[in-house]
Regions:
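Alpha-amylase-like alpha-glycosidases and glucanotransferases acting on alpha-linked glucans and related
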Residues: 1, 18-167
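Conserved, well-ordered alpha-helix/loop/beta-strand core segments that scaffold catalytic motifs
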Residues: 1-18
Length: 167
């Protein structure tokens, strides 16, 4: 409130993926692709590119988007609603993961053996916009391997992207 009263907007940051040992994953196991013992079956990362011959193996468990869809994305809505009580705009790290994400079998030592998997994209952001009842105050971190479908998703919802001068 103090910053807003001074004409300053705050930009928050939210990663798309959760750490495997986070309370979010532990308390909401059905929302993630985990086995019966709670271990990930697939994990997040990015494919090989000109920065890394083996890609990036982040190791975060991936979402069970079917379950999220069944709940109307309730977990995500709560997460974003709360974050927006702390800031005016929210930068989503790895926005491209809402269009397609790189799924790597759990236990791999590199990201080479991953594959692109479709994410809910338009359905997710349509639900988010309808539920929150206003234009989304989201900044899409659209760096890295970005294809036309990621740009179309970003533009469909009027979300600003990012440019890093160094690149």
């Amino acid at each position: 409130k103090y910053a807003n009263d001074k004409g300053i907007s705050i930009v928050g940051d939210i990663p798309i993926f959760m750490a495997w040992d986070s309370v979010d994953v532990w308390a909401n196991q059905s929302l993630f692709q985990l086995d019966s013992k709670g271990y990930p079956t697939v994990v997040a990362g990015v494919p090989p590119d000109y920065f890394s011959a083996t890609g990036q193996l982040w190791g975060n468990p991936l979402y069970n988007w079917k379950k999220h869809t069944e709940t109307g994305y309730e977990w995500w809505l709560n997460r974003i609603r709360y974050q927006l009580t702390l800031c005016d705009f929210l930068r989503i790290d790895h926005f491209r993961g809402f269009d397609k994400y790189w799924a790597i079998p759990y236990g791999e030592e590199t990201a080479i053996n991953g594959k692109w998997v479709e994410a809910p994209g338009v359905n997710f952001f349509t639900q988010l916009e309808a539920t929150l009842g206003y234009h989304l105050p989201i900044i899409a971190e659209d760096l890295g391997e970005i294809d036309d479908s990621v740009i179309e998703l970003r533009d469909k919802f009027g979300l600003p992207g990012m440019k890093v001068l160094e690149f």
